[in-house]
Amino acid sequence: PGRIYQGRRDAQPERVDLPAASLAKYVDSPMIMGEHLRSWELDSPSDAIHTFDAVAPQAESLELPHARVARFSHMLAESEAIFGPFPWGQYRFLIVLNDDLPGFGLEHRESTFIRYAESTLVNSERSRISMNTVPHEYIHVWVGKLRAQEGLLHDDYHTPGDTRMMWVYEGLTSYYDEVLAARTGLTSFEQFRDGWIATIERYMLQAGRLWKSVEDTGAGLRHLRETSPRFEDLRRRQDYYAEGSLFWMEADAIIRGATDNQRSLDDFARRFFDVAPPDTDGDVVEHTRQDVVDALHAVYSGVDWDALIRERIESPRSTLEFDSLADRLGYRFDFQPEPFTSSDKSSSNGRSANLRSSIGFTVNESGEIRSIIVDSPGWRAGLGYDMKIVGVRTRASGESTTAYSAAALREAVRESADTGQVDLLVEWDGVLRPVTIAYDGGLRYPSLVPVDGKPDFLRAIAEPRTPAPPAPPDSPTLRQTDRPD
């Protein structure tokens, strides 16, 4: 038995009697509590009760729009359309709304534990906040908690697991969290597309891919969790998430293209996770690399999946390009002189500047270089981390050097298409020096351009497979319970 300390409550009465259970069960069973807690029961296609629970410092933060609750219900149906029946007895989304805690999301067999900013629920529909962590952690019901790679889990909490196949555990999950968000309206198609544009651009500029494989980022995950203040493009991070997701997107596009959109990665997922749930707490149905290859081959046998995994996942890349992926989706990845994605449009007038795809670095509002790409035009001109740009020369300023601003720097890069250079005044360790960057490419913003006459598989991937439940404005779609004082 236990007692919640004075002034706090959880979803149970004040006295809590915890049943006898295995250590694995308790480790896998988080709990939230607080003075202000609300719960919504979601409409699930299975018999298992699904509840969305949220706790916040202020009661007014616990207003979840009916449309958002309906999208979460739709997410449950879309998930089962992809992965098969929900395998457990219940599920709870445990949400902590707090501005003072770091963001996190942690999957469990029958729940997930997520922290969001306090205003997230209230603004979720108005500001189109995707809340992608919700579908991401829910997908782990199947990817990681029903099936997981051989050697990842052990009978104790001391033996390190084999994490080389995290490109399945987290890569497949990361791919489908974007897909589920698009299919359920958590994101618009434009947001879905723009997210992939940003991911492709990111990895086209990541030189670490030339020496360190995706598999290797999984093997070294314990050392790569934290960001590095220097040369992260060479060091790499836990890229089995995002670059792993690009492999699964390519697999989806290959299958759709070869079968005239009659089959897809959804067919792989349904086959791969069609296993009997284990009865023992903490157990999973293990899979091997060969199991993945065999399941992909069963859906479409016209590709050497073993070789593709070796090339895309298990080996350093010979090139940083993604031309084949865009082409298979029915698009061309290109750069334009004007912002294309919503993110680039909103940041194009900002006080900081991301010029990684042009002169090769980012600067903050004070002009300090925060990241730089090795062998980029800026790098070749001698620029480096923490150097500070204090002056910029533009034609608009009459060829004189003006004080740094992100707008002036962007203008100088824009003019480089005619001038062939970008002239800066840089301060480093108390010393000022002029720097000329040899560059004539102008501003470059990434885009995905549809190719005439080719099927649009990106849009096909985002199409829902189940009907969306209604969310009338006069009553919640889902039963809501409140625990007032």
Predicted regions and their residues:
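Hydrophobic alpha-helical scaffolding
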Residues: 62-65, 104, 124, 128, ...
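Post-HExxH zinc-binding segment in Zn-dependent metallohydrolases
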Residues: 112-117, 121, 146-147, 158-209
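C-terminal recognition in membrane/secretory proteostasis and scaffolding
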Residues: 177, 187-485
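Carboxylate/His-rich catalytic cores and anion/metal-binding grooves
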Residues: 6, 10-30, 76, 82, ...
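Juxtacatalytic substrate-recognition/specificity segment
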Residues: 39-166
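Generic detection of short hydrophobic beta-strand segments and adjacent strand-loop junctions
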Residues: 16-18, 40, 114, 433-439
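Structured beta-strand-rich cores of soluble
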Residues: 1-48, 60, 70, 74-77
